[in-house]
């Protein structure tokens, strides 16, 4: 049962080159998240042709992109995102792999707990049912909406930062996605 849509060659080559360059060389706006093992740039691509490209993709699918956010996100070596579903504020989540090796693992369901929040995660003893790994391929990735959002997790077992490009459409009135707002994960 697939609850996400796989994407290939999502960005035109010139756009992906800009994103890859930012991941490899950093930007003046790159900063570490104070509570999570993340390196974020929430501003460099905001309201750019890259942001517009993604907005247009989702507008064509019928989504209102008025409250969309995008960011370059790096996960430090050794970090583990336990099994979780995204916050209810995320109407749509898009992830495009940029640089690394570790893909995202999706699960049909989870053992043991009826509800596991992003903050709590899921202990390894309660790993999910029927795991499927989405292969890390640069400029490929996936998207899902909150009506079909899957359980998912990943670990960065490599010695370097895992870089992805994230995009969310936010629900008005709900808390924001992971950025530097430490009250929302």
Regions found by a protein language model. Name each.
Residues 1-63:
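Non-heme Fe(II)/2-oxoglutarate
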Residues 1-2, 179-185:
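Short, Lys/Arg-enriched, disordered terminal segments
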